[in-house]
Amino acid sequence: MTEAKKSLKRTLIGKVVSDKRAKTVTVMVERRVKHPIYDKIMIKSSKYHAHDEQGEYKLGDVVEITESRPLSKTKNWVATRLVQKAALV
């Protein structure tokens, strides 16, 4: 039986908040969690540095990032695809 292997790498979707570094974008991923005592839904966010080889992702784009081997001290993710282009203001 040949079954497709399920990828063990995590994927997240977030918004590019910085594209100033060479070949790197900073992606903010927001998630909703319920407060354990007050039962209020809160939004928590985390920032990840992701590798962007061609420099194709710009500020405000929504991108998908995939976990990878460590590429530098803080960079363990790779930007894999563009989900939504940033709207022009």
Curated annotation (Swiss-Prot):
Protein name according to UniProt: Small ribosomal subunit protein uS17
GO terms for MF: rRNA binding; structural constituent of ribosome
InterPro entries in the record: NA-bd_OB-fold, Ribosomal_uS17, Ribosomal_uS17_bact/chlr, Ribosomal_uS17_CS
Pfam families: Ribosomal_S17
Single GO biological process annotation from the record: translation
Keyword vocabulary terms for this entry: Ribonucleoprotein, Ribosomal protein, RNA-binding, rRNA-binding
Function as written in the Swiss-Prot or TrEMBL entry: One of the primary rRNA binding proteins, it binds specifically to the 5'-end of 16S ribosomal RNA.
Any one GO cellular component localisation term in the record: cytosolic small ribosomal subunit
Family: Belongs to the universal ribosomal protein uS17 family.
Coiled-coil region: none
Subunit structure: Part of the 30S ribosomal subunit.
